[in-house]
Swiss-Prot record:
Keywords: ATP-binding, Hydrolase, Magnesium, Metal-binding, Multifunctional enzyme, Nickel, Nucleotide-binding, Nucleotidyltransferase, RNA repair, RNA-binding, Transferase, tRNA processing
Domain HD: 232-333
Gene it is expressed from: cca
Binding-site positions, ATP: 8, 11, 91, 143, 146
Name the record gives this protein: Multifunctional CCA protein
Misc. remarks from the entry: A single active site specifically recognizes both ATP and CTP and is responsible for their addition.
Cofactor: Mg(2+); Ni(2+)
UniProt: CTP binding residues: 8, 11, 91, 143, 146
């Protein structure tokens, strides 16, 4: 029995970036031998075991072949005579198809085992497929795009890009299940430069298949005085990248991505203005979230930002009454943390424009001050005072908040 560390750990070691976790492959063993040594079986489709001390995953070396469409359509074969090279050959990219032997004490030993020149592609900063078996799994398109958002100086090899385009043309991408699309897109949004993910998906044609609402934004004109970058798709990518640079949470980054969807459906005779795009954005966003089964926290924040970002940008012109209406409409008094995230997304929107990257955004502070004042009003006291006339509680509470905000912003 020989144990090897494989894949991302070897790649990251060569790149000089922190190794988050390791994947292990065991060559020359049977499931019974693994159990006899104290490993606990956990794999459903193929034998994966948890180490008795570290609880890290160890998989028996295996091969696979395509049996049906989509990323579920695989049959796996494992046996003690499956070699390390055969196991590495089934992997997606050369940079993920390297290994090093593991000593009994857990330390790596010996040279990098690299049958597909992954080290050369790490040095050249290239994503290159291992073999034409790459064509068999459409998830690999999403993975390459996600890797592009993490390793921003890498490019896709022309021959690999050609295979990705073929997979799109053959309809393989259409077989992807919603949960897997969201899993990869959400992980890509959390990488260093999410725009690279969408750039790669556009290059191979996959973006139009899995996120047509985003793909449709590219080439849509905006007013150059507000948006020197002009192209709506370019603007949205700048917004998402700004949110990533600030380290914002996933729901903020998704809201940044989806805030301007309605600009793609602006009537041509209205361009480059986009009057009413906020409502159209919400109309497109809700079915998108349903289709991809986007988590509720991401969906709810994205809908709020899509609907209100134009109003939030204009709060410097608003008086106390309008500010309170905005806060109440946004449920900010009950959910201040969510509203704080909405302000992050709106600030990213304002700064995600050519030449505006470092521009101040006083709107956020004005709304923070207003929210503190509005939340300071004792709703219970108002309700108690109007116990005999409960129909008037809502309006009275609103007026109290307006007075409190008026004092706070004056």
């Amino acid at each position: 029995m020989n144990i090897y560390a494989v894949g991302g750990a070897i790649r990251d070691e060569l790149l000089g970036v922190p190794v988050q976790d390791r994947d292990y492959v065991v060559v020359g063993a049977t499931p019974e031998q693994m159990v006899a040594q104290g490993y606990r079986p956990v794999g459903k489709d193929f034998p994966v075991f948890l180490h008795p001390q570290t609880h890290e995953e160890y998989a028996l070396a295996r091969t696979e072949r395509k049996t049906a469409a989509g990323y579920h359509g695989f049959q796996f074969f494992y046996a003690p005579d499956v070699t390390l090279e055969e196991d590495l050959a089934r992997r997606d990219l050369t940079i993920n198809a390297m290994a090093r032997e593991v000593r009994p004490d857990g330390e790596l030993t010996g040279p990098v085992i690299d049958p597909f020149n992954g080290q050369g592609d790490v040095q050249a900063r290239v994503f290159r497929h291992v073999s034409d078996a790459f064509l068999e799994d459409p998830v690999r398109i999403l993975r390459i795009a996600r890797f592009a958002a993490r390793f921003v100086d890498f490019t896709v090899a022309p021959e690999t890009l050609a295979l990705m385009r073929k997979m799109v043309a053959d309809g393989e991408v259409d077989a992807l299940v919603a949960e897997r699309v969201w899993q990869e897109v959400s992980r890509g949004l959390m990488e260093k430069k999410p725009s690279r993910m969408f750039e790669v998906l556009r290059e191979c044609g996959a973006l139009a298949r899995i996120l047509p609402e985003i793909d449709a934004l590219f080439g849509v004109l905006q007013r150059a005085d507000y948006h020197p970058e002009v192209d709506t798709g370019v603007h949205v990518m700048m917004v998402v990248d700004h949110a990533a640079q600030q380290g914002y949470a996933l729901q903020v980054r998704f809201a940044a991505l989806a805030h301007d969807l309605g600009k793609a459906t602006t009537p041509e005779d209205m361009l480059p203005r986009h009057i009413g795009h906020e409502g159209r954005s919400v109309d497109l966003l809700k079915p998108l979230c349903e289709r991809l089964r986007v988590p509720n926290d991401c969906r709810d924040l994205a809908v709020l930002v899509a609907r209100e970002h134009g109003n939030i940008h204009r709060v410097m012109e608003m008086g106390a009454a309008a500010l309170v209406r905005l806060l109440e409409r946004s449920d900010a008094i009950r959910k201040p943390a969510r509203f704080a995230e909405a302000l992050q997304a709106c600030e990213a929107d304002a700064r995600g424009r050519l030449g505006f990257e470092r521009r101040e955004y006083p709107q956020a502070e004005r709304l923070r001050v207003a929210l503190v004042a509005a939340r300071g009003v004792d709703a219970g006291a108002v309700a108690k005072r109007l116990a005999d006339a409960p129909a008037g509680i809502k309006d009275a509470l609103h007026q109290e908040r307006v007075r409190a905000v008026e004092l706070a912003i004056s």
